[in-house]
Structure formats: structure tokens, C-alpha cells
Amino acid sequence: MTKKSKIDHYTDKEALDFHNKGKSGKIEIISSKSLTTKRDLSLAYSPGVAVPVMEISKNPDAAYEYTSKGNLVAVISNGSAILGLGDLGALASKPVMEGKAVLFKRFADIDAIDIEIDNKNSDEIIKCIQNIGNSFGGINLEDIAAPDCFIIERKLRDTLDIPIFHDDQHGTAIITSAAL
């Protein structure tokens, strides 16, 4: 049983049921294009998809025009510093990362996908994110223990050409500044 503040009015069962009701979890992927005809399907995948593929191969910035990249954020954690719960592992952080993804969608209409990296080695986490970074318009680092979180953020800022937001650092700074 988790400790709750006086403003939390739910039971552990209600919290679990919320995450399990209907489809499990809090996020899903849906098409932004109509896929009702055979023509739609051939444009969405093969052979029609070859045209934007060729455009992006000639000009990588075209990915912002022909794919979801510009409105897609990766919410990434290794679960080493989950909220006030501590190091419970990558998989245990998934409900938090899904929760952050739905906040992006609900309040900014930004599509976000959770990625949990089952690794505590900062160099390996950096390499993993560098390898997938081009798929996203931004990276949101979440619930990664210090000092690794600072090392990871700094290295990614230096090597990726997309925004890197370290939620636990930047989010706290923004809220603190707003309060002042």
C-alpha cells in the first residue's frame, strides 16, 4: 500500500482498476490518415510509402513534413529514481512514463511514446538514445537517478539535433521560477 496525501481520495484498487479498465495502460497508437480503401492502404504503406522515403533520403529535414517526427516525443526512463519511490527498475516506471505521455497529448497535443531502458550504465543509455533519437522531435528524460541524469542529458544535448528536456531538472526549475 502506498502512502497518500490527504487530497488523494482513491484506494489502491481504484488506482489499479484505472490502469486496467478497457485496454490496459493509458496510451494507444491510431492512424492520422483514413485507411478505408485499398488505395489508402497502398498510399500508407506499399508501394506509395516509397515516395516520401525517397524524399527523406535526399533531404532528412523532409521527415518533419512527411512523418510524425515533428510532433513526437520519446519519454525515456531507466526507472532508477521513480517519483518518490526510488529505484524500482525500468518496467516498473512504465505507468509513470505512460502517464507523462498522456499529459503531453492532453495538454499540448504532442504525441509521446514511453521507452523504458533496462540498463543503469549511463554510456549505454546514451548510446541507446542516440541510436533512436532521429525518430523523434524531442526527448524527455524522466526519473533517472543523479548524477547519471545530468551526464546523459549533457551528452545528448551535445550529440543530438533535437530538444532534450530533463523533466526532473528543468520541470522543477520552471515550477520554482513560476512560484517566485
Show which residues each predicted segment covers:
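N-terminal ligand-binding/catalytic initiation module
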Residues: 2-162
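A glycine-rich, Thr/Ser-enriched phosphate-binding loop motif common to dinucleotide/cofactor-binding enzymes
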Residues: 165-180
